[in-house]
Amino acid sequence: MTRLLAPASEAELAACVKDAASPFRLQGLGTKPTLGNPVSSPQVLSLRHFTGLVIYEPEELILEAGAATPLADIEKTLAQKNQMLAFEPPDYASLLGSTSAGSLGGVVACGLSGPRRVRGGDDPEHVMG
């Protein structure tokens, strides 16, 4: 039986991690369950409530977003200022049977970078924190 933990705040998230008696799988939008290094665990820690832009300073090229923020939302916001993600995350939605390209956290967790990484760098080079 799968146990789903879905904290709604950073304090609740910290408590889930602190109280964990066994490993859990992290999940944002759940679009890349087979990519990266999947954890086999009956516990799922959902980050679905951690969405949206926290900080966006286009002049400084700074963006902070919740782990489950859809890539489409981030790309739309950046496009309004003629900006884009330098590492060009690939969209595996149709390959993985999803209707969404996924979330920022999923791209970072799976280490996904597209063809622009040659000039712009991989996603870890653009992520702090």
Feature-to-residue mapping (PLM):
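Short, well-ordered secondary-structure micro-motifs within conserved domains or adaptor modules
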Residues: 40-45
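ATP-binding N-lobe of GHMP and related small-molecule kinases
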Residues: 105
